[in-house]
Amino acid sequence: MKLSNVFLAAVVILTCVCVFQITAVPFIQQVQDEHHVESEELQENQHLTEAEHRLTDPLVLFRTKRQSHLSLCRFCCKCCRNKGCGYCCKF
């Protein structure tokens, strides 16, 4: 009985060692993967800061010259002294 328990324990340990060796990543590859992840994060952060800069840029918030050929009227109710619904051009 003891011999079978020792044999079973040896088989389990040997199996674990084999599995861990197969799934192990070499140190050089792990360092390269970490460097690749860091460079991707840096690129993402740089892209986000550019997007935030475009959103907070005050020149973006100002309207450009209005096109004179575009109508600035819209259909609305109870606006521009209209008692009912109609076109309002106060914009």
UniProtKB/Swiss-Prot annotation:
The record's InterPro entries line, in alphabetical order, gives: Hepcidin
Signal peptide segment? 1-24
Q: Name one GO biological process term.
A: defense response to Gram-positive bacterium
Propeptide positions in the record are 25-64
Keyword RNA-binding belongs to the record: no
Q: Cellular component per GO?
A: extracellular region
Q: Which domain of life is it from?
A: Eukaryota
State whether keyword Signal applies. yes
Subcellular localization = Secreted
Q: Family membership, please give it.
A: Belongs to the hepcidin family.
Tell me, in a sentence or two, what this protein's role is. Seems to act as a signaling molecule involved in the maintenance of iron homeostasis. Seems to be required in conjunction with HFE to regulate both intestinal iron absorption and iron storage in macrophages. May also have antimicrobial activity.
Name of the protein in question: Hepcidin-2
Gene symbol of the encoding locus: hamp2
